[in-house]
């Protein structure tokens, strides 16, 4: 694939994730949109690594680290969401006012 096609795809994924993160009222949907943004960034890392120097795998290795961090972030985020759901019976972001007390 050409570099421009991959960059357009990555920009589209990033913009959809950013739009979903801004407009989302559900915590789980916001986490999914954040993962979509991170996947767009990973796609850029791998694409530029392949485009500039295909012999070295620096972009691919860095994207593996980002995937590992994103998996940990998703696990912690889902644990927090399930804890809030058990206490508040809702996963809506605007109803979660835990810091007001």
UniProtKB/Swiss-Prot annotation:
InterPro entries attached to this UniProt entry: NADH_UbQ_OxRdtase_chain4L/K (IPR001133), NUOK/Mnh_C1-like (IPR039428)
Repeat in keyword set: no
Main location: plastid
Enzyme class: translocase
Enzyme Commission (EC) number: 7.1.1.-
Gene Ontology process terms (BP): ATP synthesis coupled electron transport; photosynthesis, light reaction
Catalytic activity from the UniProt record: a plastoquinone + NADH + (n+1) H(+)(in) = a plastoquinol + NAD(+) + n H(+)(out); a plastoquinone + NADPH + (n+1) H(+)(in) = a plastoquinol + NADP(+) + n H(+)(out)
Membrane topology: Multi-pass membrane protein
Keywords (A to Z) from UniProt: Chloroplast, Membrane, NAD, NADP, Plastid, Plastoquinone, Quinone, Thylakoid, Translocase, Transmembrane, Transmembrane helix, Transport
GO CC annotations on file: chloroplast thylakoid membrane
One Pfam match: Oxidored_q2
Subunit structure: NDH is composed of at least 16 different subunits, 5 of which are encoded in the nucleus.
Protein name: NAD(P)H-quinone oxidoreductase subunit 4L, chloroplastic
Species of the source: Helianthus annuus
């Amino acid at each position: 694939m050409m570099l421009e096609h991959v960059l357009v795809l990555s920009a589209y994924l990033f913009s959809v994730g950013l739009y979903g993160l801004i407009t989302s009222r559900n915590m789980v949907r916001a986490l999914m949109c954040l993962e979509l943004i991170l996947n767009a960034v990973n796609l850029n890392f791998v694409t530029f690594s392949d485009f500039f120097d295909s012999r070295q795998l620096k972009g691919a290795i860095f994207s593996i680290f980002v995937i590992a961090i994103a998996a940990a972030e998703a696990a912690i985020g889902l644990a927090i969401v399930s804890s809030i759901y058990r206490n508040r019976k809702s996963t809506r972001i605007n109803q979660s006012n835990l810091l007001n007390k």
